[in-house]
Amino acid sequence: MTKPIILTGDRPTGKLHLGHYVGSLKNRVFLQNENKYKMFVFLADQQALTDHAKESELIQESIGNVALDYLSVGLDPKQSTIFIQSQIPELAELSMYYMNLVSLARLERNPTVKTEIAQKGFGESIPSGFLVYPVSQAADITAFKANLVPVGNDQKPMIEQTREIVRSFNHTYHTDCLVEPEGIYPENEKAGRLPGLDGNAKMSKSLGNGIYLSDDADTVRKKVMSMYTDPNHIKIEDPGQIEGNMVFHYLDIFARKEDQADIEAMKEHYQIGGLGDVKTKRYLLDILERELAPIRERRLEYAKDMGEVFRMLQEGSQKARTVAAKTLSEVKSAMGINYF
């Protein structure tokens, strides 16, 4: 029986943080280890260039860092094909054909793109590559005939745009060579988008409000001890608020089942008064370190031989290119432009 295909990836614009870990990485490793799927995981460097065109050095440096993060959390190149987007030229050619099937107005209506354009402050100077990146994503997904694409809830419009392109292509060229994907969305809404340590709605590289998978133990400790809690909880005996308190928010996400009774007791104690922020932060630190310590150890080990890390990426890219080339050939045959 053929295994369903999963495609997922990240933009290499810096090291990955806890938001990436709970939002996608942890689930990828789970899906990989279930051994029920064929996994493709990629570093979307071309997409990163759509809004970092003048920062190619950052992207180049981030390729190695993100690859280390992948390996350290448990993604295994023997079980998952890990590749670099720019090393698969077939993706750019597929994008070109798909762009002929999507109007500019449709791209401008994409809610995810509209939100991101506003956040990035492009104004009237929107890079054309950024505006059409949903088409590039469709090429990424369809090149590997992905059945399932794990994404955050904010990416639902991107999946729907890909599905539209697939339907349009298959209808226009009387074929079924492209597969219509389904999105896999986070069950835990809190984990789907981890807030920053400062209480900001999202943990973000640009805001510097995150804990990175590569942070050493001392850095993690300092960051946890500086976390946003309840600004009105000045004295230990003061009643404290749970809502909006990042320490308790993180505890809800990272705690295991066996921790739940302790956490509920801490919440009650905190709200009544008599429990200080230092104690709750130390408790959270222990829980985070339980998760981060083995990741950190593996990362340090892999970092000793970056040549091997890049050999893994090269092999994965070669493997991925073979698959993408087959899809491209089918697409061109359907269009009647496979001349030779």
Curated annotation (Swiss-Prot):
Keywords: Aminoacyl-tRNA synthetase, ATP-binding, Cytoplasm, Ligase, Nucleotide-binding, Protein biosynthesis. Belongs to the class-I aminoacyl-tRNA synthetase family. HAMAP family: Trp_tRNA_synth_B. It is found in: Cytoplasm. Pfam families: tRNA-synt_1b. InterPro entries: aa-tRNA-synth_I_CS (IPR001412), aa-tRNA-synth_Ic (IPR002305), Rossmann-like_a/b/a_fold (IPR014729), Trp-tRNA-ligase (IPR002306), Trp-tRNA-ligase_bac-type (IPR024109), Trp-tRNA_synthetase (IPR050203). Its EC number is 6.1.1.2. Homodimer. The keyword ATP-binding applies. A motif ('HIGH' region) lies at residues 12-20. ATP binds at residues 11-13, 19-20, 152-154, 194, 202-206. CDD domains: TrpRS_core (cd00806). This is Tryptophan--tRNA ligase. L-tryptophan binds at residue 140. It catalyses: tRNA(Trp) + L-tryptophan + ATP = L-tryptophyl-tRNA(Trp) + AMP + diphosphate + H(+). A motif ('KMSKS' region) lies at residues 202-206. Catalyzes the attachment of tryptophan to tRNA(Trp). Its main location: cytoplasm.
